[in-house]
Amino acid sequence: MKQMSSAQIRQMWLDFWASKGHSVEPSVSLVPVNDPTLLWINSGVATLKKYFDGTIIPENPRITNAQKAIRTNDIENVGKTARHHTMFEMLGNFSIGDYFRDEAITWAYELLTSPEWFDFPAEKLYMTYYPDDKDSYNRWIEVGVDPSHLIPIEDNFWEIGAGPSGPDTEIFFDRGEAFDPENIGLRLLAEDIENDRYIEIWNIVLSQFNADPAVPRSEYKELPHKNIDTGAGLERLVAVIQGAKTNFETDLFMPIIREVEKLSGKVYDQDGDNMSFKVIADHIRSLSFAIGDGALPGNEGRGYVLRRLLRGASMHGQKLGINEPFLYKLVPTVGKIMESYYPEVLEKRDFIEKIVKSEEESFARTLHSGQHFAETIVADLKAKGQNVIAGQDVFKLYDTYGFPVELTEEIAEEAGMTVDREGFEVAMKEQQERARASAVKGGSMGMQNETLQNITVESVFNYNASQLPSKLVAIVAENAEVEAVSEGTASLIFAETPFYAEMGGQVADHGQILDATGNLVATVTDVQKAPNGQALHTVEVLAPLALNQEYTLAIDTNRRHRVMKNHTATHLLHAALHNILGHHATQAGSLNEVEFLRFDFTHFQAVTPEELRAIEQQVNEKIWEAIAVETVETDIDTAKEMGAMALFGEKYGKEVRVVTIGDYSVELCGGTHVGNTSEIGLFKIVKEEGIGSGTRRILAVTGKEAFEAYREQEDALKAVAATLKAPQLKEVPHKVEGLQEQLRQLQKENAELKEKAAAAAAGDVFKDVKEVNGHRYIVSQVSVSDAGALRTFADNWKQKDYSDVLVLVAAIGDKVNALVASKTKDIHAGNLVKELAPIVDGRGGGKPDMAMAGGSNQAKIQELLEAVAGKL
């Protein structure tokens, strides 16, 4: 077996499959593009779903890739096992309706065992297969595998919901008896026992059925086009080839671990407790790549995953004695390890470091809050005479504040308590099940549409024409190809079309189809790309249409021009965001509609009003400069030399279309645009909002819609001016400031009156002093307008020695408000109010000297008042 670096292993994989006629697909962003079903790209095939379900026919049916992926379902196992990771690379080879089982198995065996390639010892390889899949069993024997190395496994059948499915055959490497201390042998494989001896290095899925959850597997229909989908984990291959005990002792992780050794002063011991080193090395890889791809830490979705990874790694740093931000210092090391295939980490190093360091500093503050929460839990339990921290509280400390359960156990031990480990595990399992359910939901592929896949006639889109004659070359009605159609809805393909098919965030053209005499025969309501790339016109048929006849296709030019204005404005907006917010503000999604444009972009905070104004101003300046908008068709390398901005994660062909707006904007784009920015007229941002962690959205309008938006604002301002009796619009702010000053004065006078009234009422309330167990206390229901008045009562009470404890309750609206104040260390106001609040179906808390509560059951106020004495 050859000795190779991880970079050499990755490249050898790609070179082998390229030699077998495969196109090498570059790794795409971890953040899915146009796939809302996925939180992350979680496999090599995730980016190829459109090919497997037949939505798009690839230029080459043979594809290979090395794809970065993230899975966090088993995050708790990272560092505990030899092979679990949150981010990993999946090597794959794929056949979309081309070769199948025989070639897939033959070539897999060649790549692994040939001296020209990996040169694995054949006797070290074992294969599992689906028991009913005799063809795979026979093929393995034909290529030279000993039958005793073939293990039938009932679970070797791949399916996730409806769509492509089929048997799979897995390849394992035997690391020998040293990794099988109980000498269990092949039972480890046959009975699927977790082990470190037989390492799965490759899974070959033979996708030959359309899975249908409504019928038994035996009734699945054969796919019209059978596929091959394989995956080999690079980290596992590297560990086997480099003879490493675990994946972490390879050149993918050890440079990171060495840096952690320097930062911590601790030494990584392969045979000792090295979990913290492993977790840090794993998590910083995920953080570096995900942030580089535009995901940012936050409280939901992808952002929550990243925040959890960072906090976990940070806590493990503390275990190693690193008590300051340090993860950001590891980013360059990650970048250097992966530079040969993933240069983007080093290219975006400064931005990634900035985000990681900022998040580390934020977590330090959160840890302090978590410490306070833990102390509150301990104090409450002591007050109740209890000594077990509930599982849900342990989980909240873990999930919200980043406390490992071990840290909570240490806090509990110091307080003479224990934690409910079982309850914590239940809460953790519930979260994992939710994550797995979410992952399964996003994994299914759609059913293949055989009719559309089989239509291979050519169809050309004419960018410059708004109307042209063209031959009708395909008609699909009721999911079948037909010769003619006379009514209803149908899908049509023409030899040439002026209709733009929805793509790249630009909506489809609408329009009309006319016959040779100029009569309207159909209206076009939508245009989408067919699997083989043709424009598929969805039409409402008004008169008979026949195959191979010529018709006139006419787009709605007014609609097209309005969309074009919005699309060109989107390019201007993208450039302005780069200039004003920074180059990290890249496109995360867009929609160019008839009446508006919507643009999603990566940014880690809300855009300020000043920034929005500057962005809007810059876009309008470029519109008023009347810059020519030009398009150039060229190859991808030339486009990059031109400085064309490509959307990371999008796939581009050999020939691309570059849209330039002077030297202000250069982007790869297949959409339609105005000829000059002056045609846009006017640009106005109408809304900016967050739509997820690290992602912002701008809604804007152009032309007539922008003018109407300004007019609407002007009308509203005029209405305000009329109400304020301001003769000129510019006087409105002054008038409003005057009203605000009057309001502040009235509020001040009102507060003073309330204080006087409260002081007068307090005189009566504070006279009724009672005593129990040596504690003087006052308890009373008072009539006040808001909770603030209760605090005023308490402030007056503090001024004199009326009593040791004060309890006030008020019915305000349909709610109950309560206040507890204490001057004695024996009575903790926060704890007392927590005991009283449930009586009125409420909850509360606070400090030892003052606390508040709210409730909803006013009928129980008297019961609460009577309960006070028993609590003191």
UniProtKB/Swiss-Prot annotation:
Signal peptide: none annotated. Gene3D superfamilies: 2.40.30.130, 3.10.310.40, 3.30.54.20, 6.10.250.550, Bira Bifunctional Protein, Domain 2 (3.30.930.10), Threonyl-trna Synthetase, Chain A, domain 2 (3.30.980.10). Its EC number is 6.1.1.7. Coiled coil: none annotated. GO terms for biological process: alanyl-tRNA aminoacylation. It catalyses: tRNA(Ala) + L-alanine + ATP = L-alanyl-tRNA(Ala) + AMP + diphosphate. One of its GO terms (molecular function) is catalytic activity, acting on a protein. Binds 1 zinc ion per subunit. Belongs to the class-II aminoacyl-tRNA synthetase family. This is Alanine--tRNA ligase. The lineage of its organism: Bacteria, Bacillati, Bacillota, Bacilli, Lactobacillales.
